[in-house]
Amino acid sequence: MGQGTSAPQHLSEDQVSQLFAQQCYKTLEPIELYGLKDNFKATVLHQDHGDHVRMTDEEFAALLGIPSEFKSVEKLLTNSAKFLANFPFMDTKPREAGYSFNDLLKIIVFYSGRYTQVFKEFDPLKLLFVSLLKQCDVAKEVTLSEEPNLEFDGDWKSFGPVKQFYATDVSELKFPRDEFVDFLTFMLVLYGFDPSKGTVAKHIKTVVSQDKTDTKTLYADCRKSAQCISRACNGDIDLVQFRHAFDKVCPHLLAPVGHLFDLLLYTSAHSEKEDNEPVAPLNPLGSNSTYPTKLLNHATVAQMASFCPFLGNVENLKTLYMGQKDGFAQRSFESGTFGWRAPSVLLVSGLRLNTNNQSLKRANTFDEKYPRLKGAVVPDDGESEVKFGFYLDVPWRSSSKETFGSSKCFIFQLAPTQDIFVGETNPSNHAYFLKHDPGGLAFGSPIPKSIGRFTGVQAPQVVGTVSLTLDDSLEFGKFHHAGKGGSYAPSINRPGELMDERFKVRNVEVWGVGNDTDLEHQRKRIEWEEREASYRRTINKNNIAEDRAFLEMAGVIGGANRSGGSM
């Protein structure tokens, strides 16, 4: 239903408002319109609204069902809803208090992404930013002019009031940092919300159950992740930083709020029925998968999904390796990961190492093997924990001669600041797993040199300009960032900054992930392996004596009266 070029029309304010509402109306399916009408009628017809039937702010907020812990977010979103409901006049005309049916239509179209069916070109981020922070003037009653003095050529972007809005300088408008963190936290909590399966309260109950935690801990975990995202911006957030956050750092984080407003399309009877359904268990791929873990819970999954949606479905993940369970050794790592024939994601967390590690002899050895980057910025964020990840698009393998991976691989940082380092097209040093000396695994570096044949001295290793390295004992790690020219692009936040993050590893995990075809193949393989393992563990107790006699005859085990033979 895109807009076509047409001869300009002269319309009144009332006609313009009705025209936009009609275009919004056409973006919804009949069943969705039925749900919206049902919610509107059920709300306003059971209250004393007088002659003017409009939904109040309190009734609107109640339909959304935002938890009381997020009152600041509720205030932001209801303020935004009022601003968007006044489109296309926004802040150029006062609006009437409350919400009409057409107002709800407009709000849903903007937040759900359906605006792409109405606009040829559109910049939603400026409109969202301003709508969250700027209040419309409210009048007891608003009458739109019926004089046809507005020119409209079919393109809303060139319509006078809209054009005026986008030309307005909003550089003085700032998103208070604490409120921005609250907003991000709620988006992370809301990740995975499906309005067809019940209310926000049901969603939170489900997440708490699946994470084996409590509401307070869930909110705290999500707030910690939100702070990591917010550190990509400095101070209070202006429009430039808001764009950076939602264009580059977390481009998919706003999706949950669209689903929140889609709640208005589901009848209260449907929501009540779904809320009474039992919480569905979360089933990661493979019966031996573990969830949640030290590194993977709802907050982490939501944070990864904010920049890479296909990492956000736990049911498409399989535990391949967990350092705390399987042991911090390359052999254990290899045993867990090398059989997986689809993409995977590695997560590693650790504690930052100081420049002077006299108390950690092995840390000094690591420093000698991987020299520090001169001129690197000393972190001043006050955080001690770091968390990195790496997405590998091919199976793991040993790499004594050549590296593996492709430009689809990428390094990412989750803490203390969210950052992404995408794979470059031409370079080839995307990943290596090295068993012989000096050993270890790295992403973005060439295969290292071995110890000198005659001197027995370990030469300092060369790492890629943007690279992540773990030593052979999976005890220490290093993230190196020295600009362009490597297998991975520089930071999206600080591309020109020299960084050398060194850390003592606390946890390492690898999770298998893939598309539907990969996963179906892997499901069959896993089921076969589990059946075989179960079969091998099964002993036919009725044939123990017969089996033992056969093994004695074959010389595999010794009989009670049997003497040893001679060479």
Swiss-Prot record:
Family note: Belongs to the RTC5 family.
Annotated protein name in UniProt: Restriction of telomere capping protein 5
Function: May be involved in a process influencing telomere capping.
Gene Ontology CC entries for this record: cytoplasm; nucleus
Residue span, TLDc domain: 294-514
Cellular location(s): Cytoplasm
InterPro entries noted in UniProt: TLDc_dom
Main location: cytoplasm
Keywords: Cytoplasm
Native source species: Yarrowia lipolytica (strain CLIB 122 / E 150)
